[in-house]
Amino acid sequence: MGSFSMWHWLIVLAIVLLLFGRGKIPELMGDVAKGIKSFKKGMSDDDTAPDGTPKPADQSKTVDHRADDHK
């Protein structure tokens, strides 16, 4: 039950080519690439303000909580 042999991968590749055809696979890969580019652009847009300057880091406050002594 180890990894697949080369013949297994060739059979899988042949089935994929039969199902999708030669023209459909590059189209699918192009759509995936466009999605990745769009995602990266969206992530980089979150890091900049509308005027193009980087947003300042969020200032967080440290709050110390102490248990009250109940006697």
From Swiss-Prot:
Residues 40-71 are annotated as: Disordered. Gene3D superfamilies: 1.20.5.3310. It is found in: Cell inner membrane. Signal peptide: none annotated. InterPro entries: TatA/B/E, TatA/E. Keywords: Cell inner membrane, Cell membrane, Membrane, Protein transport, Translocation, Transmembrane, Transmembrane helix, Transport. The keyword Transport applies. The chain crosses the membrane at residues 1-21. One of its GO terms (molecular function) is protein transmembrane transporter activity. It comes from the Bacteria. Its main location: membrane. One of its GO terms (biological process) is protein transport by the Tat complex. Residues 61-71 have a biased composition (Basic and acidic residues). One of its GO terms (cellular component) is TAT protein transport complex. Belongs to the TatA/E family. Part of the twin-arginine translocation (Tat) system that transports large folded proteins containing a characteristic twin-arginine motif in their signal peptide across membranes. TatA could form the protein-conducting channel of the Tat system. The Tat system comprises two distinct complexes: a TatABC complex, containing multiple copies of TatA, TatB and TatC subunits, and a separate TatA complex, containing only TatA subunits. Substrates initially bind to the TatABC complex, which probably triggers association of the separate TatA complex to form the active translocon. This is Sec-independent protein translocase protein TatA. It comes from Allorhizobium ampelinum (strain ATCC BAA-846 / DSM 112012 / S4) (Agrobacterium vitis (strain S4)). The lineage of its organism: Bacteria, Pseudomonadati, Pseudomonadota, Alphaproteobacteria, Hyphomicrobiales.
